């Protein structure tokens, strides 16, 4: 039986010169995860209003999302009413309104579009689709101007269980109105954990959550 060859290990010798595996010298040996602190709404508002790069980051994807329009289809076939619907929506400048709502969602973590529909009911009552004639106007609200009133769906079998069914909206003049959620198109913000969403009163993430250090 032959002699076992000795294995020469000079890792420690080499590492002493290269720094490999040494935490203080090898950037791949260890790393720290720094958590970002969410910006206050006013900080985001100022950033979006006065920082040109921040505004582009918010608005360009929002504008692109609506630039091609859309069509109504059944399977792969466009339905007969599609062009009529688009014509009606163009009359109320749907693309500008949706781009604005998407921009506020990206910037603030949430927004909503109030659909002004004459169905013979009050704003705080559920929308009656059978009596609804047409969408007369679309009004956009940022997350800052929307608050749940404390009324929630309580039936566990309801797909909307736990969600608010009544919101208070405040316009630019300070006037407020209670609105049933069926009259709103809600944009709930970027994907975050349920725990973080609870911390943010049901709203989601913003584009500034992960890039704020590069802008401030």
Question: Model-predicted segments: where are they?
Answer:
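Structured, mid-chain assembly/scaffold modules that mediate subunit interfaces
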Residues: 45-207
């Amino acid at each position: 039986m032959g002699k076992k060859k000795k294995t020469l290990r000079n890792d420690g010798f080499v590492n002493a010169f290269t720094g490999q595996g040494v935490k203080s010298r090898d950037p791949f040996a260890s790393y720290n995860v720094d958590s970002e602190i969410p910006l206050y709404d006013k900080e985001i508002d100022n950033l979006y209003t006065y920082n040109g790069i921040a505004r582009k980051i918010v608005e360009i994807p929002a504008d692109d999302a609506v630039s091609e329009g859309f069509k109504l289809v059944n399977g792969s076939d466009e339905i007969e009413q599609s062009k009529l619907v688009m014509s009606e929506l163009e009359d109320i400048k749907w693309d500008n309104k949706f781009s604005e709502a998407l921009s506020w969602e990206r910037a603030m973590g949430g927004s909503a579009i109030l659909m002004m529909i004459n169905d013979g009911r009050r704003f705080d009552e559920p929308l009656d689709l059978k009596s609804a004639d047409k969408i007369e106007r679309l009004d956009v609200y940022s997350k800052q101007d929307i608050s749940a009133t404390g009324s929630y769906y309580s039936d566990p079998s309801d797909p909307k269980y736990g969600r608010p069914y009544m919101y208070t909206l405040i316009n630019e003049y300070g006037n407020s109105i209670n609105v049933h959620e069926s009259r709103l198109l809600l944009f709930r913000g970027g994907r975050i954990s349920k725990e973080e969403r609870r911390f943010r009163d049901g709203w989601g993430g913003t584009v500034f959550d992960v890039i704020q250090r590069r802008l401030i």
